[in-house]
Amino acid sequence: MPNYYDELEIEDFAWDPVARVFHYPCPCGDRFEISKGQLRDGEEIAICPSCSLIVRVIYDYLDWEDYVTTDDEDDGGSVDTPLSNTSPDPAYPVVVGSAEVESQSKTASSAVSSQKEECTSLSDRLAGLQVESGKEDDPVQEHKREDSSDVLH
């Protein structure tokens, strides 16, 4: 009987559509991996290719009976994985289409511009309070003037 490093549920693993494996971070910095084919065959050991650690994967074999495709047939584009509440590991990003990236870029840029507007509004409010209190020669005011001159260029 092998000596397992840990026991993990399949729901804790993330799906890598490029390598077509479920993966989970390993303490060595690499990742434990197990394929759908291994799960269909009843295997329950995920191996880290960089070190000697193995984990036992806990899953309900009956949930995996529905997978009638082989790993080679999965190249057709559809990935039939169970729903999971886990998100992919940020160390292994998933490539998305250019339209999605462009959309995300526009969303991020609009968020930045709204933050700039909010900062400007707060700076204006602070400047007004400083004028009321008699502290007009303040570094915040000078910084604000420098920023506004940068915007004009």
Swiss-Prot record:
Which keywords has UniProt assigned to this entry?
Answer: Cytoplasm, Iron, Metal-binding, Nucleus, Oxidoreductase
GO biological process assignments? protein histidyl modification to diphthamide; tRNA wobble base 5-methoxycarbonylmethyl-2-thiouridinylation
A cellular component term from Gene Ontology for this protein is: cytoplasm
Ranges of Low complexity composition bias in the record: 104-114
Q: What is its main location?
A: cytoplasm
Q: Where in the cell is it found?
A: Cytoplasm; Nucleus
| Chain positions covered by the region annotation Disordered | 69-153
Keyword check for Phosphoprotein: no
Q: Where is the DPH-type MB domain?
A: 4-60
Q: Which family does it belong to?
A: Belongs to the DPH3 family.
Q: What does this protein do?
A: Required for the first step of diphthamide biosynthesis, a post-translational modification of histidine which occurs in elongation factor 2. DPH1 and DPH2 transfer a 3-amino-3-carboxypropyl (ACP) group from S-adenosyl-L-methionine (SAM) to a histidine residue, the reaction is assisted by a reduction system comprising KTI11/DPH3 and a NADH-dependent reductase, predominantly CBR1. Acts as an electron donor to reduce the Fe-S cluster in DPH1-DPH2 keeping the [4Fe-4S] clusters in the active and reduced state.
Return the protein name.
Diphthamide biosynthesis protein 3
Organism annotation: Cryptococcus neoformans var. neoformans serotype D (strain JEC21 / ATCC MYA-565) (Filobasidiella neoformans)
Encoding gene per record = DPH3
